[in-house]
Amino acid sequence: TDCLHCLAARLAGWEKRQSAAWLPFIGTCVHERFEHLFNKRKDEFTVPDDDGGEPWAVKRFEAERHVDVGSIHGLHGYHLIHGSIDLYDAENNTTIDWKITGPTTIRNVKANGPSQQYRIQASLYGIGLENDGEPCKRNAIYFLPRNSVSLADALPIEFDFDPKPGRWALSRAQLIANLLDLIEQEDGTEMRDAWIHALPTSPTHCFQCGSWPDDQLGQLSELNENQYPALPDKWRQAIGLLESTYRKTER
């Protein structure tokens, strides 16, 4: 995510307000149907035996493949970073992600490519596969039209697996966790929460914004400022250590 505020709030264990989530429900239903369809398939391919024996058959598709990506350590234990790959194509060493989206997202992807969040998610899936001893060569994202009558408007995107964005995201999350712990140890949880409140939100769009205790007032959330202590300059300057966006050309 490019939303530092939401990432820090999640790492700090803030309670998130749950609301009726109709669009995510639609996405969940589509994912479950695809899982059922691909798990019924019998596609196989053969791989050579390492000991010189007969080649053996391997199932090509695995839906909802669980992977452990890494962990973020802090004062209150650690966060295990894990997830499920919507579909893994073992023959082509490719992760496949279904995105059920509206026309605006599809137009944006056509114009600008997949968002940072989607690319980092794909990178993390590949890292998780490599942690399991599986190779990952490609990442694919299928943008499926939520509002169309057919899949004619679907947009498949495929690119080479790159572990760097995922490693950057994990390192950034650990840095935020370290700063949260440092502030809490030195000045307490209220100051820690004030620092989280001061972090920038997404410059584009974030589905989690508006669901945390400090932004229940939406665009009027700045009225909540007086419930937090004033941030010392050293903590405000620490915000400058954090990057919202991954810049490939600089790495």
Q: Which residue ranges define each predicted feature?
A:
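Short, charged/polar micro-motifs that form catalytic or ligand-binding hotspots
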Residues: 16, 20, 24, 111-119, ...
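Mg2+/Mn2+-dependent nuclease catalytic core
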Residues: 58, 62-180
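Non-catalytic, well-ordered alpha-helical scaffold segments
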Residues: 27-31, 123, 203-204
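Metal-dependent nuclease catalytic cores that hydrolyze phosphodiester bonds in DNA/RNA
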Residues: 1-94, 248-251
